[in-house]
């Protein structure tokens, strides 16, 4: 269920401060964050944000299409290795 419009989008303040500082300085280095729950704002467009997936930081280049989505949507946490192959099908 989506968040109530009355409440507005959520973003961690520490991430917002880092993004504002990077935009102000025109800094293009990746911004490390563990905040997968934060919503992507229009200010983020063009920045690279390294989102933690539980094991490492995955670099995410933010585009205009990503605005309104959560950061965690673009850093998958599970690795799919495929189903076990049938031994009879290999022959």
Curated annotation (Swiss-Prot):
Annotated S-S bridges: none
GO cellular component: cytoplasm; small ribosomal subunit
Protein name: Small ribosomal subunit protein uS19
A GO BP annotation: translation
Presence of the UniProt keyword S-adenosyl-L-methionine in the record: no
Role: Protein S19 forms a complex with S13 that binds strongly to the 16S ribosomal RNA.
Highest taxon in the source lineage: Bacteria
Assigned keywords, A-Z: Ribonucleoprotein, Ribosomal protein, RNA-binding, rRNA-binding
GN (gene name): rpsS
Family to which the UniProt record says this protein belongs: Belongs to the universal ribosomal protein uS19 family.
Family annotation (Pfam families): Ribosomal_S19
Gene3D superfamilies attached to this UniProt entry: 30s Ribosomal Protein S19, Chain A
Alphabetized InterPro entries for the sequence: Ribosomal_uS19, Ribosomal_uS19_bac-type, Ribosomal_uS19_CS, Ribosomal_uS19_SF
GO molecular-function terms, A-Z: rRNA binding; structural constituent of ribosome
